[in-house]
Amino acid sequence: MLGLEGPCWVGPGPDGGLAVSEEFGDVRLFGSARQPLGSLGGWTGHTFGCPAGICSNSEGNVIVADEQRRQVTLFPRAGPPICLVSEGLGQPLGVACAPQGQLLVADAKDNSIKVYQGLKELA
């Protein structure tokens, strides 16, 4: 996969593909045969600060932690991006989707893993 600009994080993309975040850039998507499909910023007009961790949920939506903007954003298959979490995040680096539907966020600012269910942080 060539043409990347400062690749930082790689994660599963929709339909068996890959998603790659670029430092202070965009998030590029690749198909299951590793062919370039485009970028989330290009498709949605979303401007990233510093995209970091990436995951895909069971519906095939891509979720991105943005370290600089201190938020986690969901990119649905259709429609505009949706900010899932912004309050209480200091430096979100990693994200993961748990099988039970929870969203896990690694926050490097306070050295914690935050667990969200239905967009509310669980204790």
UniProtKB/Swiss-Prot annotation:
PROSITE patterns: NHL (PS51125). Gene3D superfamilies: TolB, C-terminal domain. NHL repeats lie at residues 35-78, 79-119. Transmembrane segments: none annotated. Keywords: Repeat. This is NHL-repeat-containing protein 4. The lineage of its organism: Eukaryota, Metazoa, Chordata, Craniata, Vertebrata.
